[in-house]
Amino acid sequence: MLYIANDAGHSVTQWQLGMYGTKSVYAGIPGRPGDNAAQLRSPEGLTFDKYGNLYIADCENNRIQMFCPNSLDGITIAGTGQMGNSSNEFYFPHDVAFDSELNLYVTDTYNNRIQKFARIQ
């Protein structure tokens, strides 16, 4: 599988690789930006955890959304949805990644920092 964040389309597409690769929308509503649980606004980086949950840097909503497998609604796990520079705020988060301990790292573009969020026990 290949997952592509479609910034202008406000969605994440899942491509099944193969001779006749098929695609489907995995998260967000194509062409419908928004800030509710099912919508994204300019998604950028994405990553999966070892449980199959998808984490998306929802850039213009200034939040990190987690989508569980087969779920249409995301859960905001970091960020407030507003621009800011406190410890749980972002100013255009661009990418997300996990380390081997499942700590989450977020590149926070216009705050010129990388934020680390400890694994939730």
Give residue spans per PLM region.
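Solenoidal tandem-repeat scaffolds enriched in leucines and small polar residues
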Residues: 1-25
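Short loop/turn segments immediately following the C-termini of beta-strands
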Residues: 7, 17, 59, 69, ...
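Loop/turn-rich, solvent-exposed surfaces of beta-rich toroidal or solenoidal domains
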Residues: 37-69
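Gly/Pro-rich loop segments of beta-rich domains
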Residues: 19-44, 70-94
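Blade-level signature of beta-propeller repeat domains, shared across WD40, Kelch, NHL, RCC1
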Residues: 91-121
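Structural signal for beta-propeller blades
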Residues: 10-13, 23, 62-65, 112-114
